[in-house]
Regions:
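Elongated scaffolding segments in large macromolecular assemblies
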Residues: 2, 9-14, 206-209, 213-216, ...
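Generic structural signal for short, flexible, solvent-exposed coil/loop and linker residues
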Residues: 141, 177, 200, 205, ...
Length: 315
């Protein structure tokens, strides 16, 4: 296949939270492998474009991203335990371990953890022996944090097979998703919402299949959505991540920009942190000065015991 400094990522639709996080994960993985990638959005239908400093083929992009994923996976040691019932002391132990690493490794490990748990956000009904911290906005699973960690482990499980990983990443990035993988889901893809009334099959045998490569990249991309504790007050949610906002007291929405000029992960983080991203009606003139042409927003809903993020809409 022809080498190029730009690759259109046909699999990553702009109105899908999983696809957006996958884009962030791709950039992080390539950075971890020593590249200096950028991305921007263009065309009809709208898709992100990966820009590289040197011409590479799609196969080289996927293989290098797989190598970067293996490097990034070292930051997810907190997911190795069978259950995710962290006490305050256990979380402090993880944070101290990150501090004792090199500055870059420590920041990466802390960022990966903060997307799912932060020290200042305690559970409302704190009980001995139970998980001490509030649910992350990105946690859509109904069985508590043990479900979350089990799903993270499942997403990381095939990383030892570099060629298989590269093939899965290429499918997720360069082709329309077929969702053929029978794996666990973090439920960041709106297709995970399945209605079972009048279904020909039992729900347990007719669950939504996944695009595993996209889920893998999204795990790493989520670390750019740094978590923090909120003031709480009357809200039931005391934990937000970058790009998210509270709605209706306890609901949560996640917003992300569409930018027209090549940006790195640091630049994208800065856009996510812009105050205009959380406004009901973002000021288009202000955002246009930052090359942002649109803002997409998805809402977390609970149709049953599991949450899911809706298809995003332009606001």
């Amino acid at each position: 296949m022809t080498a190029s400094t730009e690759h259109r990522l046909e699999g990553l639709e702009p109105d899908n939270l999983l696809a957006f996080l996958s884009l962030l994960g791709l950039l992080r993985a390539l950075e971890a492998a020593g590249w200096r990638p950028r991305a921007y959005w263009e065309g009809l239908p709208l898709r992100p474009v990966l820009r590289l400093r040197e011409a590479k083929t799609q196969e080289q992009v996927a293989l290098t991203a797989a190598e970067g994923c293996t490097v990034l996976a070292r930051n997810y040691q907190f997911a190795a335990s069978g259950e995710f019932k962290l006490s305050i002391d256990q979380l402090k132990s993880h944070l101290e371990a990150a501090i004792n690493c090199s500055p870059a490794e420590g920041r990466s490990a802390d960022a990966c953890l903060s997307a799912f748990v932060v020290e200042g956000s305690l559970a409302k009904d704190l009980k001995p022996g139970k998980h001490a911290f509030a649910r992350s906005p990105l946690d859509c699973l109904g069985g508590g944090q043990s479900d979350l960690l089990s799903t993270l482990r499942d997403g990381l499980s095939l990383l030892g097979q570099s060629q298989s990983t590269a093939n899965a990443l290429a499918k997720a990035l360069f082709a329309v998703w077929k969702r053929e993988d029978d794996r666990k889901s973090l439920r960041w893809d709106q297709s995970d919402y399945r209605r079972h009334a009048y279904s020909a099959k039992a729900p347990t045998k007719d669950h939504a299949r996944q695009e595993w490569g996209a889920n893998l990249l999204a795990i790493f991309g989520s670390s750019l959505l740094l978590g923090c504790a909120t003031a709480g007050g009357r809200s039931k949610l005391s934990f937000l991540v970058l790009g998210s906002r509270l709605v209706d007291g306890s609901g949560v929405e996640v917003s992300w920009p569409i930018w027209l000029h090549p940006a790195s992960t640091s630049g994208i983080q800065a856009l996510l942190a812009h105050p205009g991203m959380s406004e009901d009606q973002p000021n288009r003139d202000i955002l246009a000065a930052l090359s942002v042409s649109a803002v997409y927003r998805a809402r977390k809903i609970w149709p049953n015991q599991y949450a899911v993020f809706t298809r995003a809409e332009v606001v």
